[in-house]
Structure formats: C-alpha cells, structure tokens
Amino acid sequence: MATIESKLVEMLTVPVEALGFKLWGIEYIQAGRHSILRVFIDHENGINIEDCAEASRQVSAVMDVEDPISTEYTLEVSSPGVDRPLFTAEQYRAYIGEETKVQLTMPVAGSRNLKGVISSVDGQMLTITVDGKDLIVALDNIRKGNVIAKF
C-alpha cells in the first residue's frame, strides 16, 4: 500500500514542474485533528519567497480538487534549505561524501539515530560511515534524513 507521501508526490510532481521547479520532497505530519503538509521545491538558481507563494497557490488548487487529505492541515511550501531533507536514493547519491544524520524506524547497530558520512548508495541500500565503521541501512528504514550544513 502506498503511503500518503508517495501519493502526494505522484499527484503534485507535474503541477510543480509545470511552474519550472523540482518537487524535492514531501513531509506529512499528523498532529491530532490538524496536520502539516510540507512541500519542498527546488530550482538550480535557488528558491525565493515569490517562488514558494506561486507553488503554494498551485499545490493548494490541486489539493482542493483532488482532496487527498480528509482532515484539516496547514500547507507549508519552502526550499529544502541548507540542512536539506533527503527523500530518494538519487538525493542520497548526490550527497556521497557529505555528513548526514538519519532517524531510523528500526535500529541499526543498536541506534535509531545515526550521524556520519554517506559512503555509497547501491539500489535502495545506503552505506553511512559512523565513527569509522560502515553501516548499511535500507532506505525504507529511514524515517528522516538530512544533510548537515557546513559553515
């Protein structure tokens, strides 16, 4: 069964791309009777507030017609930012050699929170080097992953 996030990605990719943006990813956070839908958009030249407003109007129109979420929710549209969330194998692959933190559904090496360097991505498996040790994590075991920004 597809998750609500995967259904939303399928539903919103074309409308967002029609505006010239890339749909970077979606987070749907259920919080009681009111939920949050975060839509991350990206562009090779960056994203500004006007881009977010334009994409928000487009996404809102699609959501009103398709109505995939039956409860109240707040729509947030933004760029992925410097500590960008990672959603796909392609995105993890693009950040090989970068430091990341991942929250897991099931523990790996006794931990659900890992912080290390992405070593490789093979299919749906991520290798992350944590304290000099390579750990292999299935991408579907990652609840949340983010690049750690360097300043």
Swiss-Prot record:
Record Pfam families: DUF150_C, RimP_N
GO cellular-component term (any): cytosol
InterPro entries, sorted: Ribosome_maturation_RimP, RimP_C, RimP_C_sf, RimP_N, RimP_N_sf
Keywords: Cytoplasm, Ribosome biogenesis
Record bears the keyword Cytoplasm: yes
Superkingdom, natural source: Bacteria
UniProt keyword Transferase, yes or no: no
Record's subcellular location: Cytoplasm
One record GO biological process: translation
Membership in a protein family: Belongs to the RimP family.
HAMAP family for the chain: RimP (MF_01077)
Function as written in the Swiss-Prot or TrEMBL entry: Required for maturation of 30S ribosomal subunits.
Descriptive protein name: Ribosome maturation factor RimP
Organism per entry: Shewanella frigidimarina (strain NCIMB 400)
